[in-house]
């Protein structure tokens, strides 16, 4: 009798999990498509349409070397990007709770914006779905169990927007034409292996430190203060992104692996480690 009851309970739990997964997947996919439509609607024409190394004159030496290494003179400019990632995500800011994730990301370079859709798997395959986005000056962070039950839902034009624009700038190593001066990035020398990049979008102006490796490619991007979500509040915290495993994609040198971390008083706390498994570019005609 006990065995029969246990089997029935197990079947009910399984059916519930399957139902939540199916319902949540449908709901989340609709929300994801809405985000992507909003992102695409912000797109404006990229000018100029070709990379011209003449605009590198006067830039800090490591920045010039980076562009000459990662781009080709005369190549078209990146308009948009579709990419897929796979990796692990640490769901705790105090202990190590790494879980596997897969994600898809859309990027438009002008007006700068992105929409990241992630699926983080817990035990028994229970999903946490995440939207991380910057669209038309608005920052968005929404995480939901099964895609249905919100765990975090923050959006706005304040610190959350600034933090998401920082992500766009840091990840420009994946779409390097967006870092050119003609695309609105101002560069200032720091050392022979580093420089500050400043960008402005709407009312947001931010500066990040770029460090270049021995191959003249972006190795690390960091900032002294980026908004970290703690108990539903935004806390300014030092942050970095680290990139490696550069490979040629569509004529550009881009990193396939990355790690991002908060720099807490007791040391670095990585929370995202991933690899690009597919990247598709749309270029200017």
Report the location of each language-model feature.
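Buried hydrophobic residues that stabilize the cores of well-folded domains
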Residues: 67, 100-105, 133-137, 141-142, ...
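N-terminal leader/targeting segments and the immediate start of mature chains
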Residues: 31-82
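Gly/Pro-enriched, hydrophobic low-complexity segments
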Residues: 197-281
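Short, hydrophobic/aromatic-rich segments at coil-to-beta transitions
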Residues: 78-84, 110-117, 140, 190-198, ...
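N-terminal mature ectodomain segment of secretory-pathway/periplasmic proteins
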Residues: 64-150
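Aromatic-capped interface at the extracytoplasmic side
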Residues: 21-31
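Hydrophobic membrane-insertion alpha-helices, especially the h-region
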Residues: 6-23
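Flexible, processing/modification-adjacent segments and terminal tails
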Residues: 142-201, 234
């Amino acid at each position: 009798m006990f065995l029969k009851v246990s089997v029935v309970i197990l079947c009910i739990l399984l059916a519930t999990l399957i139902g939540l997964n199916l319902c949540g997947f449908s709901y989340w996919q609709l929300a994801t498509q809405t985000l992507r439509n909003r992102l695409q609607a912000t797109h404006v024409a990229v000018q100029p349409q070709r990379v011209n190394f003449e605009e590198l004159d006067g830039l800090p030496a490591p920045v010039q070397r980076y562009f000459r290494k990662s781009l080709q003179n005369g190549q078209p400019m990146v308009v948009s990007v579709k990419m897929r990632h796979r990796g692990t995500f640490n769901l705790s800011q105090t202990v190590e709770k790494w879980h596997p994730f897969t994600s898809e990301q859309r990027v438009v370079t002008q007006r700068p914006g992105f929409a990241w859709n992630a699926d983080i798997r817990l035990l028994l395959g229970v999903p946490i779905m995440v939207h991380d986005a910057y669209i038309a000056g608005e920052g968005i962070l929404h995480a939901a169990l099964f895609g249905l039950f919100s765990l975090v839902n923050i959006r706005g034009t304040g610190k959350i927007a600034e933090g998401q624009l920082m992500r766009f700038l840091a990840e420009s190593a994946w779409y390097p034409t967006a870092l050119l001066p003609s695309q609105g990035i101002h560069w200032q020398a720091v050392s022979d292996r580093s420089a500050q990049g400043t960008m402005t979008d709407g009312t947001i102006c931010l500066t990040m430190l770029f460090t270049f490796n021995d191959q003249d490619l972006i190795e690390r991007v960091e900032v002294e203060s980026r908004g970290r979500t703690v108990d539903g509040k935004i806390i300014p915290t030092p942050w970095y992104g680290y990139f490696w495993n550069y490979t040629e994609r569509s004529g550009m040198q881009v990193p396939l692996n990355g790690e991002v971390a908060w720099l807490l008083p007791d040391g670095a706390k990585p929370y995202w480690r991933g690899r690009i498994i597919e990247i598709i570019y749309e270029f200017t005609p």
